[in-house]
Amino acid sequence: MKKIELLAPAGDINKLKTAVEYGADAVYLGGESFGLRKASKNFSMEDIKWATDYLHERGKKIHVTLNIIPHNDDMEGVEEYIKELYEIGVDALIVADPGMFMKVKEVAPDFPIHISTQGSVTNVETVKFWQKLGAERVGMARELRLKEVADIIKEVGDTIEVETFAHGAMCMSYSGRCLLSNYMTGRDANMGDCAQPCRYKYNLVEEKRPGEYFPIEEHEEGTFIMNSKDLCMIEHIDEMIEAGIASLKIEGRVKSEYYLATVIRSYRMAIDAYYADPENYKYDPSLLEEIKKVSHRDFTTGFFYGQANEDSQVYEDNSYIRGYDFVGIVLDYDEETKIATIEQRNRVFVGEEIEIFGPGIKHFDYKIEKMLDDKDREIDVANKAKQIFKIKIEEPIKKGFILRRENEE
């Protein structure tokens, strides 16, 4: 049985390293053009070259987004861009638009192409269509039931790979093809600049009574009528693998290293546990509890088990649940002195109790008894952005381990 791929996002080089350290098999990222995430830092061509070498040295793959829905003017420079990515050795391009697909085929005929979920693929005939044109993989629309995905895979066999989203934010528009942002703010979601108006709060107003709000709200601040819960399929890894899915995709190129480390680690552990003993695999509830320790909305299984309904939305507000704070990330650990060098992410004091975790292991508790700055002077608090501080940790850790603290607010 070919092992399912865990595909993770990377908004910058540090996040890419985190994704690899915590178990991603492949990483998807955007360049400075033609992608759908303007909010992430994205990668220069030099960065993509470095990332490709870094990933290939570790047996991982790199997929680059080319998934805008372009107008004529937006195609300027795309041929040279494709050529550069091909020469660098990028493993695949993620494409949504048929014109962009044909342009890739024209410039680099053997460049592997993955069809983005923005392509709105919902049936087996469309999968066959893309396969005949030469696509290597199709990312299925999020509106499909898991049984539909399994049936499609059964019919197309190994002629083309099928990818689905497994975790992350959900768009209320069909496969992400939203015009609300463009209409309301002038920011085009199909060009990577979504303002997320689906998360705004709304009230009903009658046109002849401006300023008079009708009392239909679930919350005193308004009605959140399009505010989807986040997708989370950690409880159903076995069913997704057994459906024949080739790749599970995690959303979140603008998320933090802490978010990526936590989510990727949990899915990696679930996937590995399944393949270690498929017949006796049992879902581990602690993995979901770990995922709940990062910033998130309430969770849903989306459309995988039927039509999304009122339980798939958050009506009360548009805020995230933040049960834990990201304290810092380990830059170095001296095994002789047991001194860990940490880069701070949130203010932390001597005397606080924190949790520490790393790739493939359960977290452990730790109380900060003493803290030094980067010049080995004793301090009581690390309160400057990305401040370097040192603490002694007897339990062996490594570079890339994460420190977090329960948020009591």
Language-model features, listed with the residues they occupy:
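Short beta-strand elements of ligand-binding domains
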Residues: 64-66, 95, 115-117
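Alpha-helix capping and helix-loop boundary segments enriched in small/acidic/polar residues
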Residues: 39, 118-121, 140, 224
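Alpha-helix capping/helix-boundary segments
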Residues: 99-100
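Surface-exposed amphipathic alpha-helical tracts and adjacent flexible/coil segments at the periphery
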Residues: 1-22, 26-29, 33, 52, ...
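Glycine-rich, positively charged N-terminal anion/phosphate-binding segment
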Residues: 37-54
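Conserved phosphotransfer cores of two-component systems
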Residues: 108
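Gly/Gly-Pro- and Ser/Thr-rich, intrinsically disordered tail segments characteristic of DNA damage-repair
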Residues: 76, 111, 115-122
